[in-house]
Swiss-Prot record:
Disulfide bonds: C105-C180
TM annotation in the entry: 32-54, 65-86, 107-128, 149-169, 195-219, 249-270, 284-308
The name this protein goes by in its record: Substance-P receptor
Glycosylation sites noted in the Swiss-Prot or TrEMBL record: N14, N18
One Pfam family it belongs to: 7tm_1
Residues in compartment: Cytoplasmic: 55-64, 129-148, 220-248, 309-407
Subunit structure: Interacts with ARRB1.
Gene of this entry: TACR1
SUPFAM superfamilies per record: Family A G protein-coupled receptor-like
Annotated lipid attachment (S-palmitoyl cysteine): C322
Native source species: Cavia porcellus
Extracellular side: 1-31, 87-106, 170-194, 271-283
UniProt keyword list: Cell membrane, Disulfide bond, G-protein coupled receptor, Glycoprotein, Lipoprotein, Membrane, Palmitate, Receptor, Transducer, Transmembrane, Transmembrane helix
Database matches in PANTHER family: G-PROTEIN COUPLED RECEPTOR TKR-1-RELATED, SUBSTANCE-P RECEPTOR
Length: 407
C-alpha cells in the first residue's frame, strides 16, 4: 500500500515512473460516465446523510450522549473525506493526471489517513463506552468534557500519523502530464516506505478492529448469554433490549467498515508480493472498484442509523419532511420532555438519594431505540439511541440484575 488515497506517485507507480508515454490507461467515455455516476452517489449520500446525523445529535439536547458525541466525530470525518477526496480520487484514477497543484497534492495524501484514523477510533471509543456501561456499570462514565478531550486526542494522533505522507508528497512533471507522488527518503530496500505503510495498515485497520472485536464479543456474551431474572420488572427487560439494539447497530457499523476497507488494504500490500500485478491492463478497473468500495464506507452509517434506530429515523423524517414520499413523524420524540436531564451517573445518584431511593447505574447512559416518551417523565429520561435512564430502582432489584448479568 503506497498510501491511503490516492496511490503513490500515480495510479500505477511502476508504470508512471518508467515510461515516457503520457498515459497508458485510457478508457472509453461510457465507462467514465458509469464510474462518475457511481462516485457521485457516494459524495451526495455521504455528505447529506452525515450532515443530517450531526444535526440530529447536536440540535437536540436529549441526543447529546457520550456515544452520540463519538458518532458526530465519525460523521464529520466521513463527510469530510467524501467531500474533499472522493471526486479528486476519481478524476486522478480515470485520467492518471494531477490537476490540483502542490498544496492539494499534500492535503490529498494527508487528510484521508487522518479521517480514516478518526473514524475507526471513534468506533473504538464507542465500543469501549459500551463495554464499560455493560461490563462495569458501577464505574464512572465519561463526562461530556472528557468525551470532547478524547475526540481531540484522536484527531491529534490522526494528524501525527498522517503527517509523514503529507510532508513527502510532491508533484512531478512527466511527458505530457503532471502526477502527484510521494518521494520517500532514498533507501535501497524502500524501508521507510514499507515500515510506514505497515504501521498505517495496522493502526487504522487491524489493531482497532481487534480491540472492537474483543469488546463486542465480551459485551455480546454478557447481553445474550445471560438470562434475565423471571421476577424482574418490564423496565429491566426494556433496558437489556435497549442495550442489545445499540450493540447490534454498532456491530453492523464496524463490520461494514471492515468489509469496505479490507480489499483496499490487500490491494496495496500486493505490490510487495507481486510487483508485476500493476502492469496488467485490467488493474485500473480493479482499482476503481476497490476504491469505490472503500470510499462508499462513508455513506452507509446514516442509512444504518436510520434503519436500526427510532430516534434517528424520526430525525431523518423531519429533515426530509418536504419530500412527498416521506410520511410525517412525531418529531417530539427528539425533544426534551423532562427538565431533569442528567449527564452523569453522579447527578442521577444524588437526586435519587434526595428521593429516598437508590439510583441504579444500569442504563444510566444506555440507548433504547424503541423507547417512546413515557407518561411520567419526571422519573425517566430517554436519550439518544434510545437511552433509558431509570432514576429509582430498589437495592434488591439492582443487585438481582447485576448478579445475573455478570454471572
Amino acid at each position: 500500500m503506497d498510501n491511503v488515497l490516492p496511490v503513490d506517485s500515480d495510479l500505477f507507480p511502476n508504470i508512471s515512473t518508467n515510461t515516457s508515454e503520457p498515459n497508458q490507461f485510457v478508457q472509453p467515455a461510457w465507462q467514465i460516465v458509469l464510474w462518475a455516476a457511481a462516485y457521485t452517489v457516494i459524495v451526495v449520500t455521504s455528505v447529506v446523510g452525515n450532515v443530517v446525523v450531526m444535526w440530529i445529535i447536536l440540535a437536540h439536547k436529549r441526543m447529546r450522549t457520550v456515544t452520540n458525541y463519538f458518532l458526530v466525530n465519525l460523521a464529520f470525518a466521513e463527510a469530510s473525506m467524501a467531500a474533499f477526496n472522493t471526486v479528486v480520487n476519481f478524476t486522478y484514477a480515470v485520467h492518471n493526471e494531477w490537476y490540483y497543484g502542490l498544496f492539494y497534492c499534500k492535503f490529498h495524501n494527508f487528510f484521508p489517513i487522518a479521517a480514516v484514523f478518526a473514524s475507526i477510533y471513534s468506533m473504538t471509543a464507542v465500543a469501549f463506552d459500551r463495554y464499560m456501561a455493560i461490563i462495569h456499570p458501577l464505574q464512572p462514565r465519561l463526562s461530556a468534557t472528557a468525551t470532547k478531550v478524547v475526540i481531540c486526542v484522536i484527531w491529534v494522533l490522526a494528524l501525527l500519523l498522517a503527517f509523514p505522507q503529507g510532508y513527502y508528497s510532491t508533484t512531478e512533471t512527466m511527458p505530457g502530464r503532471v502526477v502527484c507522488m510521494i518521494e520517500w527518503p532514498s533507501h535501497p530496500d524502500k524501508i521507510y516506505e514499507k515500515v510506514y505503510h505497515i504501521c498505517v495498515t495496522v493502526l487504522i485497520y487491524f489493531l482497532p478492529l481487534l480491540v472492537i472485536g474483543y469488546a463486542y464479543t465480551v459485551v455480546g456474551i454478557t447481553l445474550w448469554a445471560s438470562e434475565i431474572p423471571g421476577d424482574s420488572s418490564d423496565r429491566y427487560h426494556e433496558q437489556v433490549s435497549a442495550k442489545r439494539k445499540v450493540v447490534k447497530m454498532m456491530i453492523v457499523v464496524v463490520c461494514t467498515f471492515a468489509i469496505c476497507w479490507l480489499p483496499f488494504h490487500i490491494f496495496f500490500l500486493l505490490p510487495y508480493i507481486n510487483p508485476d500485478l500493476y502492469l496488467k491492463k485490467f488493474i485500473q478497473q480493479v482499482y476503481l472498484a476497490i476504491m469505490w468500495l472503500a470510499m462508499s464506507s462513508t455513506m452507509y452509517n446514516p442509512i444504518i442509523y436510520c434503519c436500526l434506530n427510532d430516534r434517528f429515523r424520526l430525525g431523518f423524517k423531519h429533515a426530509f419532511r418536504c419530500c412527498p414520499f416521506i410520511s410525517a413523524a412525531d418529531y417530539e420524540g427528539l425533544e426534551m420532555k423532562s427538565t431533569r436531564y442528567f449527564q452523569t451517573q453522579g447527578s442521577v445518584y444524588k437526586v435519587s438519594r434526595l428521593e429516598t431511593t437508590i439510583s441504579t447505574v444500569v442504563g444510566a447512559h444506555e440507548e433504547d431505540p424503541e423507547e417512546g416518551p413515557k407518561a411520567t417523565p419526571s422519573s425517566l429520561d430517554l436519550t439518544s439511541n434510545g437511552s433509558s435512564r431509570s432514576n429509582s430502582k430498589t437495592v434488591t432489584e439492582s443487585s438481582s440484575f447485576y448478579s445475573n448479568m455478570l454471572s
